[in-house]
Amino acid sequence: MRSSRITLVLGGAVAVLAFAAGIALGAGNGLKRLNLPGAANRPFSHVVVDGGTIYVAGTLGLDAETGKPPADAKAEARLALDDIRRKLELAGATMDDLVWVQVFCPDLELYDEFNAVYRTYFEAGFPARSFVGSGPLLFGSRFEINAIAVGG
């Protein structure tokens, strides 16, 4: 019985210390939240930098004038990847700094079309990547991309 109380107390102490460390790391730790110029006031950042790790999420390939995806899937993939590139440049990184990419697509038949464009964006090898079948995406998009880069 005494052994389980000691274990419980030690476990609780470890949990409190871990929680306190998390708060200390999260409060004023130098997170940078970056947005492309002219971005609408939306409830998210285009890029978040934490130390040497760069996070980009929810990137769509929308036409700047219409706010909609172009008719051609490859053109949409190009717009989305160009947008990822611009966002990485905000943080001083390049496409070759990417270590992880996640692509959501409601039509898995577009896998080869996406890859034909995607492969042209890298010189130093490819990041780890998943291509995930999804439900409908915002604005009728065919692709939504999340990415993590290291370095820059």
Where are these regions (language model features)?
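N-terminal presequence-like segments and the immediate start of the first folded domain
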Residues: 4-82, 86-99, 104-152
